Amino acid sequence: RTDTGVHAEQYFFHVDISKDQDFDSLLNRLNLMLPQEILIKSYEIKNPDFHARFSAISRTYEYRISQKKEPFLNTMFNHISHNIDIDLMNESCNKLIGFNDFTSFSKVHTEVNNFNCHVYEAFWTKKNHQIIFTIKANRFLRNMVRAIVGTMLLVGRNKISIQDFCDIIASKSRSSAGPSVKAKGLFLTKVNYNNNG
């Protein structure tokens, strides 16, 4: 599942159906029925206990920013024209790595009671006028990536310090963090599973 407006380059779902199917034909028929924005690329037959959401061991997201107005990429990049210090934001990324309570970057009204996530990697890259944030973790909270990016941009614009960023994480308070960025720049890019199953 992703937040409304978020893109997915790799996404999985599971369905329980009879094995007595022509799966190639089924795949083609499903793609004919789906809207233009959605394409089923392939299928695999899995063990009965496989669950597309709960069997995943990690997920990777990217948040894409363009510092130049690009009409043809408007739905895929968030346009932010401010000067941004990538080095400072990468320094703040180091504070995310490991097992942390990410309450500060979660939706305020949520049914979730476990806010701990293990972040394996987080970094910013820049190519020409495009800036991309990549983050990989075992799980994500609703709105988490967008809130992290919004807060890191405050670091990158020298509105808050690295220590402030650490204090925000430690506060476990959403009101301490920065605003969430728009959903349109966020992409689910990879979902990892164990080989068995």
Placement of each model-derived feature along the sequence:
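Structured-RNA-binding interfaces characteristic of tRNA pseudouridine synthases
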Residues: 1-197
